[in-house]
């Protein structure tokens, strides 16, 4: 197991890391090199949630990657067949996604504020990932259009609310859920079916621009190569030779002019 570089220890402004709870998040490692961050959506979502809390100095966060193709003996001993994400709080391991969310919301300082209640937004972003997977598998215009229609609805919502993020000018759990999925759509969609988010969806691009400015996203984001390989494995496609030697790239450019 390896620790990622974005470990957050709160020791500034006279506050010792021992004054706040120490939280460990175990995430899936890259399926290319087995060490860096992998392309698990839930892993990135909870990484972002916890990173935001670490920035607020309510917790000290340690993030550890595990190569699930060759899990180390101590991981197999402690967690058997369980796959990350796994959250460890004061020795207590939380193993299921819904339980992790509930634990962050109810038991981790500041977590309650991340989990805002907004039925409209919850409905708006659900099933987006399903549409991506259907597009990648079916590779037809109908599936492309279904995904495009969904993105248009998100764009219209952002335009109507005229806020920086989904529910306001402060990030919440919905943003930590949506943005990793948008990144997968952007990277995998382009690679496999030449799908691109249209430039006329200006509110959506502005939203992505704001997300790209945040350490919570950039520190948790997997490399383009890992996102692509994630779907190659699902489709039983082969890796390129010496793919582990490639320098990781991260697509974050914005193709339109963003006026603040």
Swiss-Prot record:
It is a single-pass membrane protein. The chain crosses the membrane at residues 42-66. It is found in: Mitochondrion; Membrane. The keyword Metal-binding does not apply. The keyword Transmembrane applies. Belongs to the chloride channel CLIC family. Might insert into membranes and form chloride ion channels. Channel activity depends on the pH. May play a role in ethanol sensitivity. This is Chloride intracellular channel Clic. The gene is Clic.
